[in-house]
């Protein structure tokens, strides 16, 4: 056969060589020819016209496919038969055909009409698959490549045929009708397609060539370790062949091969390495089966499948079974390998709810799985108590085993969701789904058995091996720099203070120097000399109770007196008796759990002799738990002066830093993030380098990488000991931008939507999530930036940069979170998709979202983060991307957080897994199809500036979305109030409802009846009438926060508020009087915060507050109210802590009874009458001097506003007369700078003018 091909096709190879040369040697590119718009004006046009014409004449003269015989041209180049040459030729041909297809201008001489484009697209696919085949044979072959010359030759001829068609397609002007007619070109392309099943020569066909080469490979399949991308490509070849002739009869085989192909691309090579040989066998067997069938059918046109199977002796079910096994294995592995390794324990809750919904909504599609799904549901429900234990007992002695089992359970939950969805959408065959669910049931059963076995194991883990302890930095003789004020405070507590025993506890994040500071005090002679016994022990995360006791006894009575053979209880008694009559100083370092203190505290007797215990811990809760008299000390981070002082001391010792290095040194110290440990690490690097500016500059440039790598072990240790239910919450901080304050309510809503929060009967998910957050704060992993004034709850937080970087890096390692930055180098088309399954993707550019969307079908979250501060608060339009259509690729999307920054063209109502949406919209209505999002829990839609002020119509179908927990839309109104009243369900889960717009009290009552469990409500009302008697509007009993804004300012409120558990009330724009406030107060016995803004106080502008009104009120704020006379009874506001008065210009004075409110801590007066200021100062004098209220604070502010409306870029300029500071609220145009300065100089306060000039100078405007 080889000789036949050599003799018969040598002439064709000669033409192939010519066509390849035209493409490759002369660098002819179809696209480049098209883009050369000025051909006619240059000599190049004549040259190329001649080249094209001569080549076409040569092709047609020598080979007319195959009308004319070929002349014998002797071409026997060994390189022509090499796979490398063949692949290079195919690459060139594919590139040119692609260029040809991109030309869409009908006036171009290269334009390809539509019917011919379809044929060329088919040919392109054939060429790509042919290249895969050549690559596969070349990679898998262990014999010399010349053994497959026939195959490579045939591949080259097929590719070259297309090259000739491309050249023949090119027209030549001025030659009349001598060009190849379009119909002939079309036939030539059809000839090529027919070569797939037609015999080229009696006894020789394309299929027979493929059979020969596959049989050769089958006999010697090696242990090949090739990239699996090639594997997925080679699967496409036999799969694609099934589209001709027998596809209807071989549908099952075709389906399996398609599944194999589609899933291989998602499977990392490491997960295939133990199956590559089996994979090769399956691919070769599939090819042999298909090509053998087609080889016989090509010779016998009327042959049916049964005849072919009989002739070949095939048992089709038996031949297909290995393929089926491999398909299932690859599908399962492709899904499992990309699951995140960190999970939220609330995912099982979400799955169980969805399984019930699925079986109701898709009963027909899931009918054949009914029994299996019920078994799975029962097994998951039986696991719920175990998952509860994992959350509630994070320090269980079998913590590792528990968390491993919990992780396996969550992974099975992911699989069930995926398989059920695939069944509903018919994306996976029934045989595969049934096998997969049976395996899941078996695996869940094994997990349950492991848990049950664990529960029967005797607990013998009182002592834990300490081999995994984090290597500690040297503590003794370590000179401390900084914290001088802290040291002095602690020294006084150790030597003075209460007569009884006291615990001096320090807590703070890793690396702050707690241990160093404690050892400094412990070794201070002035301290130690005052105690009879000094002893210390280091606890760490893993410890032995007995070893701690032995360490303390060795210090207390000496090494020789310690009896190590005693039991722990006996040693504890010995220690207690040793300390009992003495004044002792004990250092207990690095305590991780309250239970440690429970174990040790009984050994430390209190006999009122000023004994002291120093305790260090990372966790606030531990420090607070151990405290007796002194409050726990939260060790602060270094300031810039201390940071530089420590760095200088560590690098230069007793010497001083060179003036040349001081600036760069201070910059490096600042870059260390004020963390002493980080500063010490960098100092070690600098100490080993030449003291040259260039060297230090290099350190500064690389500081981020080095400091984080070196300090990672400390942070990693804190992360390692986190309970598994907190790990996902902590890593999720990696989705936020650096140095940005994080809003807590938003963070908690995201945590819940991501299934990080495990439900607990009797508690809301929000309350549980707040507990998770406080735990992370107590471990010093999260920094609080703002707490609520009334209840002390955290309102905002942030992460230190070191911790944030750790979260991002670790989250990527765990396949949990991937950042796709606008300068991302790795594109989805050029990488292995290791993050496309159930991960969270954070984007910084909308274009990245478009590029990645096609490869992210199983992503669970899409988070958009805008780095550019210029766009802060400015929504970005996504119309150019049609984002709603792009998002359809994310079929498992549960969280879509566009951070109020992206305008979406429409809500993606097809994504029924969605639980959280936050975005901007331009429309004034929402489609009724939004109810398709039946899993949605949080809907936050902001309006663009064009839509601001307009009422948005909310369809009545929203009230069918019974899982909604948070609905935030500015100024919305129900579209059909009658339908809302008659047909809609109650939203029992809805907790926050922001900005509905009511025009009647009846409308408000109706909506409140539909939302019985609201906790927070912000709404706008339009009160049209002033009734003779107030109507009592009953708000939900659980309501805690209410903000009411009146759209028609200073209209009377037409209802009385009744909310027995309301803690926060804000009224704005109303006309009120004492009667209304008195009646309201009777219904608000638990109110803690009252804010009245822009309120008109009746005709007399008077407010009488009697005894018993607002008994729990802590904060009272009045702003721009018309209040003139304020009469307050002596015993009113008994628990008031803060009083804020802003622009209350008519108020005569603050009532004198505020002098006697012992709980009062703060009064703020801004832009009020001088008499009000005077009364506030009198209250301060009485509170501080007479009541000894040392915590009382008075703040007086006077602000003058200069509105420079004629100046571009200026909104307002405010001068604070008390603090002498000036603020420009917007940037100023450079052209207007001088005008701004001149106008400011007219202000009487020259120092304020100087301040703004300095600001402008820093901005580069002066």
UniProtKB/Swiss-Prot annotation:
Please verify whether the record's keywords include Thylakoid: no
Tell me the ranges covered by the HMA domain, including all copies: 1181-1248
Look up the record and report any one GO term of the cellular component aspect.
membrane
Q: Where are this protein's LRR repeats? A: 890-914, 933-961, 1036-1059, 1064-1083, 1084-1112, 1133-1157
Could you give a single Gene Ontology term from the biological process aspect? Answer: plant-type hypersensitive response
Enumerate the Gene3D superfamilies for this protein: Helical domain of apoptotic protease-activating factors (1.10.8.430), P-loop containing nucleotide triphosphate hydrolases (3.40.50.300), Ribonuclease Inhibitor (3.80.10.10), Winged helix-like DNA-binding domain superfamily/Winged helix DNA-binding domain (1.10.10.10)
Tell me which residues bind ATP: 508-515
Q: Which SUPFAM superfamilies match?
A: L domain-like, P-loop containing nucleoside triphosphate hydrolases
What is the protein's major site of localization?
A: cytoplasm
Under CDD domains, the record lists: RX-CC_like
Q: Does the keyword Transmembrane helix apply?
A: no
Protein location: Cytoplasm; Membrane
**Domain spans labelled NB-ARC:** 475-761
GO MF, one annotated term: ATP binding
Ranges in a coiled coil: 364-384, 475-496
- Classify the protein's membrane topology as the record does: Peripheral membrane protein
InterPro entries in the record: Apaf_helical, Disease_R_plants, HMA_dom, LRR_dom_sf, NB-ARC, P-loop_NTPase, R1A-like_N, RX-like_CC
Role summary: Confers resistance to late blight (Phytophthora infestans) races carrying the avirulence gene Avr1. Resistance proteins guard the plant against pathogens that contain an appropriate avirulence protein via an indirect interaction with this avirulence protein. That triggers a defense system including the hypersensitive response, which restricts the pathogen growth.
**To which protein family does this belong?**
Belongs to the disease resistance NB-LRR family.
The protein in question is named: Putative late blight resistance protein homolog R1B-23
- Species: Solanum demissum (Wild potato)
């Amino acid at each position: 056969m080889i000789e036949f091909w050599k003799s018969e096709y040598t002439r064709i190879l000669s033409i192939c060589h010519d066509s390849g040369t035209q493409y490759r040697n002369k660098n002819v590119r179809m696209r480049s020819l098209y883009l050369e718009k000025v051909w006619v004006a240059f000599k190049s046009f004549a040259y190329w016209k001649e080249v094209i014409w001569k080549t076409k004449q040569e092709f047609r003269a020598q080979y007319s496919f195959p009308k004319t015989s070929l002349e014998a041209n002797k071409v026997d180049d060994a390189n022509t038969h090499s796979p490398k040459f063949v692949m290079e030729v195919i690459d060139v041909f594919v590139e040119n055909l692609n260029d040809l297809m991109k030309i869409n201008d009908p006036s171009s001489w290269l334009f390809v009409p539509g019917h011919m484009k379809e044929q060329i697209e088919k040919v392109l696919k054939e060429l790509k698959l042919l290249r895969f085949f050549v690559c596969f044979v070349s990679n898998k072959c262990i014999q010399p490549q010349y053994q497959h010359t026939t195959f490579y030759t045939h591949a080259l001829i097929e590719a070259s045929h297309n090259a000739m068609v491309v050249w023949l397609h090119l027209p030549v002007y001025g030659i009349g009708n001598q060009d190849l007619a379009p119909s002939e070109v079309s036939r030539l392309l059809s000839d090529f397609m027919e070569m797939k099943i037609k015999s080229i020569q009696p006894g020789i066909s394309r299929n027979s060539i493929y059979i020969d080469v596959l049989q050769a490979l089958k006999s010697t399949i090696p242990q090949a370790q090739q990239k699996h991308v090639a594997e997925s490509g080679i699967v496409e070849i036999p799969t694609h062949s099934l589209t001709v002739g027998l596809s209807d009869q071989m549908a099952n085989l075709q389906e399996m091969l398609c599944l194999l192909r589609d899933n291989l691309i998602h499977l990392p090579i490491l997960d295939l390495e133990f199956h590559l040989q089996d994979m090769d066998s399956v691919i070769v067997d599939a090819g042999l089966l298909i090509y053998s069938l087609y080889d016989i059918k090509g010779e016998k046109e009327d042959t049916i499948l049964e005849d072919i199977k009989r002739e070949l002796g095939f048992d089709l079910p038996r031949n297909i079974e290995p393929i089926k096994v491999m398909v299932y294995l690859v599908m399962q592995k492709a899904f499992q390998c990309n699951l995140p390794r960190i999970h939220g324990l609330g995912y099982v809750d979400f799955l169980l709810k969805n399984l019930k919904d699925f079986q109701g909504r898709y009963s027909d599609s899931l009918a054949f799985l009914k029994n299996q799904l019920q078994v799975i549901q029962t097994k998951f429900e039986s696991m719920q108590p175990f998952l509860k234990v994992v959350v509630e007992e994070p320090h269980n002695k079998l913590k590792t085993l528990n968390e491993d089992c919990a992780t396996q359970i969550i992974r099975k939950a992911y699989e069930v969701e995926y398989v059920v969805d695939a069944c509903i959408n018919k994306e996976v065959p029934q045989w595969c789904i049934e096998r997969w669910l049976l395996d899941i049931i078996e695996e869940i059963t094994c997990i349950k058995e492991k848990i049950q076995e664990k529960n029967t194991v005797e607990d013998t883990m009182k002592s834990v091996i300490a081999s995994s302890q984090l290597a500690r930095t040297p503590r003794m003789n370590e000179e401390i720099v900084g914290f001088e004020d802290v040291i002095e405070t602690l020294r006084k507590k150790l030597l003075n203070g209460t007569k009884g025993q006291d615990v001096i506890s320090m807590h703070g994040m890793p690396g702050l120097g707690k241990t160093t500071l404690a050892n400094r005090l412990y070794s201070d002679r002035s301290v130690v000399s005052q105690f009879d016994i000094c002893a210390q022990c280091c606890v760490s995360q893993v410890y032995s109770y007995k070893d701690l006791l032995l360490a303390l006894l060795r210090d207390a009575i000496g090494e020789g007196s310690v009896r190590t053979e005693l039991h722990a209880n006996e040693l504890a008694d010995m220690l207690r008796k040793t300390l009992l009559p003495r004044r002792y100083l004990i250092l207990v370092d690095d305590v991780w759990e309250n239970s440690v203190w429970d174990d040790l505290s009984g050994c430390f007797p209190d006999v009122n002799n000023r004994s002291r215990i120093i305790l260090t811990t990372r966790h606030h809760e531990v420090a607070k738990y151990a405290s007796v008299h002194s409050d726990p000390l939260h060790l602060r981070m270094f300031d810039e002066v201390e940071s530089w002082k420590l760095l200088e001391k560590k690098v230069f010792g007793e010497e001083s830093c060179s003036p040349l290095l001081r600036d760069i040194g201070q910059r490096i110290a600042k870059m260390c993030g004020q963390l002493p440990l980080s500063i010490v690490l960098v100092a070690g690097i600098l100490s080993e380098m030449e003291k040259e500016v260039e060297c230090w500059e290099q350190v500064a440039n690389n500081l981020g990488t080095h400091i984080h790598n070196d300090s990672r072990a400390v942070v990693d240790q804190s992360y390692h000991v986190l309970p598994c239910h907190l790990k996902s919450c902590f890593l999720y901080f990696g989705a936020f931008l650096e140095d940005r304050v994080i809003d807590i309510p938003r963070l908690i809503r995201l945590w819940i939507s991501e299934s990080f929060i495990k439900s607990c009967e009797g508690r809301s998910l929000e309350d549980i999530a707040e507990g998770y957050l406080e735990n992370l704060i107590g471990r010093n992993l999260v920094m609080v930036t703002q707490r609520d004034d009334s209840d002390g709850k955290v309102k905002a937080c942030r992460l230190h940069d070191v911790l944030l970087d750790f979260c991002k890096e670790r989250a990527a390692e765990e396949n949990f979170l991937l950042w796709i930055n606008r300068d991302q180098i790795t594109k989805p088309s050029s990488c292995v998709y290791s993050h496309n399954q159930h991960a969270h993707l954070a984007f910084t550019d909308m274009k990245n979202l478009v590029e990645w969307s096609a490869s992210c079908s199983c992503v669970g979250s899409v988070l958009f983060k805008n780095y550019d501060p210029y766009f802060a608060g400015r929504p970005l339009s996504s119309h150019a991307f049609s984002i709603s259509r792009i998002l359809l690729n994310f079929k498992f999307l549960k969280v879509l957080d566009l951070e109020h920054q992206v305008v979406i063209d429409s809500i993606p109502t097809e994504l029924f897994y969605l639980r959280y949406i936050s975005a901007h919209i331009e429309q004034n209505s929402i489609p009724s199809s939004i109810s398709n999002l039946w899993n949605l829990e949080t809907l936050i839609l902001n309006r663009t500036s064009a839509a601001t002020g307009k009422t948005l119509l909310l369809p009545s179908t929203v009230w069918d979305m019974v899982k909604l927990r948070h609905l935030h839309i500015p100024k919305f109104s129900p579209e059909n109030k009658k339908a809302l009243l008659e047909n809609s369900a109650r939203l029992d889960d809805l907790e926050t409802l922001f900005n509905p717009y009511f025009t009647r009290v009846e409308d408000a009552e109706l909506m409140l009846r539909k939302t019985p469990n609201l906790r927070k409500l912000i709404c706008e009302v339009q009160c049209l009438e002033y009734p003779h008697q107030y109507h009592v509007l009953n708000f939900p009993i659980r309501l805690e926060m209410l903000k009411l804004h009146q759209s028609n300012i200073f209209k009377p409120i037409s209802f009385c508020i009744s909310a027995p558990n309301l803690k926060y009330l804000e009224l704005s724009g109303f006309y009120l009087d004492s009667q209304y406030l008195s009646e309201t107060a009777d219904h608000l016995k638990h109110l803690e915060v009252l804010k009245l803004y822009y309120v008109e106080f009746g005709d007399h502008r008077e407010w009488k507050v009697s005894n018993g009104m607002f008994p729990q009120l802590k904060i009272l704020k009045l702003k721009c109210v018309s209040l003139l006379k304020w009469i307050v009874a002596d015993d009113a506001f008994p628990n008031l802590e803060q009083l804020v008065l802003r622009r209350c210009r008519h108020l005569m004075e603050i009532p004198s009874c505020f002098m006697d409110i012992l709980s009062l801590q703060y009064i703020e007066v801004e832009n009020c009458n001088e008499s009000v200021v005077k009364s506030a100062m009198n209250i301060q004098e009485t509170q501080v001097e007479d009541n000894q209220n040392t915590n009382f604070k008075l703040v007086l502010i006077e602000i003058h506003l200069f509105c420079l409306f004629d100046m571009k870029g200026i909104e307002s300029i405010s001068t604070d007369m008390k603090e002498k500071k000036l603020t420009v609220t917007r940037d100023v145009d450079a052209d207007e700078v001088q005008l701004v300065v001149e106008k400011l100089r007219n202000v009487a306060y020259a120092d304020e003018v100087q301040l703004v000039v300095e600001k402008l100078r820093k901005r580069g405007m002066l």
